[in-house]
């Protein structure tokens, strides 16, 4: 890729139907983990007009009212009126959970290669990524796409823009010059709204109250704004589209700036490496960049079901590393335990912490629950690499 280019990422709000499904799945996971931290959970959700379907595989000693959890999640998001197409009080909730297959459980409970550890819950490949485009070490486009829909939610909830409704989408196109974010080329923001508000009022409020307070002002000189481009967005949420768990995996991660292994996160307990290993790979990549070993870092790990140790740990810095990628990979293997149980212990994942992750991104957020965002191994990596002093930060 040329050093001068446009790159786009999108995000969606908590009221987007797929995110409603993700949040219900993770709320159920949290409710179970609060009682049984060793539960095996794969909670899938479908939501449509007036209907929620809960299915998947759960093995637990916990006693959870799944219907109540689903309704409370819908209420918290803001779907509390039948005019919105789904109302927490009156929607139908169907529950169809099975137990985890014993064939899978035997490989997870006792790894074939490591009797002191648990095996991976499935085969698969996972990626982690970090770069120095923002203080959070996230790609600029996805970071700000998240902040836009988060701002939409804040203004809806505090009543400053009372005509806003829960469903919204953002898209940020950034112009890169010499490989660094230079300016914001285009912002798309579509928000569900009350029927009586005019398009002109929506456009002015969205630009002045949502977009401009969020994006860096020095990057907006020639920005194009596309606000509700269809001209009307009254019908939204699960009424506008059927929502499913795990259908926003690029929104959940790096906005397309890094590869994705294909496995979704929400509703899965940390024995599922789709989730826990992706979190660990982000933790590794962020510490590599925070240590000043590279300006950007992509980490791939892969697993076989029932086997504890990763098949591979590969680091790629796209030529930005100050030491060879192979040397960074060796440091990662020495200082990070990427076996499933090692990840769980390293990041303290057997906690009911997942509800917050289900909207506005799993990465790049300074929340106390997000242990994978810590940079506590950066100095250790720097010293192990033989580098002196503190790393130089180079944010856009």
UniProtKB/Swiss-Prot annotation:
Location of the region described as Flexible loop in the Swiss-Prot/TrEMBL record:
100-110
**Cofactor: how bound:** Binds 2 divalent ions per subunit.
Primary enzyme class: transferase
Residues engaged in binding ATP: 16, 167-169, 232-233, 241, 247-248, 264, 268
What pathway does the UniProt record associate with this protein? Amino-acid biosynthesis; S-adenosyl-L-methionine biosynthesis; S-adenosyl-L-methionine from L-methionine: step 1/1
The molecular function terms of the Gene Ontology recorded here are: ATP binding; magnesium ion binding; methionine adenosyltransferase activity
E.C. code = 2.5.1.6
Chain positions recorded as Mg(2+) binding sites: 18
> In this UniProt entry, which cysteines form S-S bonds?
none
Predominantly, its location class is cytoplasm
* Residues annotated to bind L-methionine: 57, 100, 241, 272
What GO CC terms are in its UniProt record?
Answer: cytoplasm
One GO term under biological process is:
one-carbon metabolic process
User: Which cofactors?
Assistant: Mg(2+); K(+)
Q: Which UniProt keywords apply?
A: ATP-binding, Cytoplasm, Magnesium, Metal-binding, Nucleotide-binding, One-carbon metabolism, Potassium, Transferase
According to UniProt, the reaction catalysed is:
L-methionine + ATP + H2O = S-adenosyl-L-methionine + phosphate + diphosphate
Residues noted as binding K(+) in the record, renumbered to the chain: 44
Q: Which family does it belong to?
A: Belongs to the AdoMet synthase family.
Q: What does this protein do?
A: Catalyzes the formation of S-adenosylmethionine (AdoMet) from methionine and ATP. The overall synthetic reaction is composed of two sequential steps, AdoMet formation and the subsequent tripolyphosphate hydrolysis which occurs prior to release of AdoMet from the enzyme.
* PANTHER family on file: S-ADENOSYLMETHIONINE SYNTHETASE
Q: How does it assemble?
A: Homotetramer; dimer of dimers.
Q: What is this protein called?
A: S-adenosylmethionine synthase
Which gene name belongs to this protein? metK
């Amino acid at each position: 890729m040329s050093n001068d280019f446009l790159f786009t990422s999108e995000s969606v709000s908590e009221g987007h139907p797929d995110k409603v499904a993700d949040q219900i799945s993770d709320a159920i996971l949290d409710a179970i983990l609060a009682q049984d931290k060793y539960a095996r959970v794969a909670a899938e959700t479908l939501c449509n007009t007036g209907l929620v379907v809960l299915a998947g595989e759960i093995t637990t000693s916990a006693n959870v009212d799944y219907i109540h959890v689903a309704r409370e999640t819908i209420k918290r998001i803001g779907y509390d009126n039948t005019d919105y197409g789904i109302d927490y009080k009156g929607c139908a909730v169907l529950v169809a959970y099975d137990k985890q297959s014993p064939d899978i459980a035997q490989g997870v409970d006792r790894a074939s290669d490591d009797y002191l550890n648990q095996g991976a819950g499935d085969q698969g490949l996972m990626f982690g990524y970090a770069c120095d485009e923002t203080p959070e070490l996230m790609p600029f486009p996805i970071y700000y796409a998240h902040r836009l829909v988060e701002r939409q939610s804040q203004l809806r909830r505090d009543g400053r823009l009372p005509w806003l409704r829960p469903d919204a989408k953002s898209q940020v196109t950034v112009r890169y010059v010499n490989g660094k974010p230079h300016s914001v080329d285009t912002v798309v923001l579509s928000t569900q709204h009350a029927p009586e508000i005019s398009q002109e009022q929506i456009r002015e409020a969205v630009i002045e109250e949502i977009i401009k307070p969020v994006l860096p002002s020095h990057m907006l000189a020639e920005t194009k704004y596309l606000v509700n481009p269809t001209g009307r967005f009254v019908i939204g949420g699960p009424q506008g589209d059927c929502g499913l768990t795990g259908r926003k995996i690029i929104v959940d991660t790096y906005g397309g700036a890094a590869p994705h292994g294909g496995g979704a996160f929400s509703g899965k307990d940390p024995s599922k490496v789709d989730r826990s290993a992706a979190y660990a790979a982000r933790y590794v990549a962020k510490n590599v960049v925070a240590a000043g070993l590279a300006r950007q870092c992509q980490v791939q790990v892969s697993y076989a079901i029932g086997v504890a140790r990763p098949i591979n740990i590969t680091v790629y810095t796209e030529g930005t590393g100050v030491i060879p990628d192979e040397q960074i990979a060796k440091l990662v293997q020495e200082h990070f335990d990427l076996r499933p149980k090692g990840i769980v212990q390293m990041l303290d994942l057997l906690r009911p912490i997942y509800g917050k992750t289900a909207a506005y991104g799993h990465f790049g957020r300074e929340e106390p629950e997000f242990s994978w965002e810590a940079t506590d191994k950066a100095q250790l990596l720097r010293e192990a690499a033989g580098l002196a002093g503190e790393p130089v930060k180079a944010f856009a």
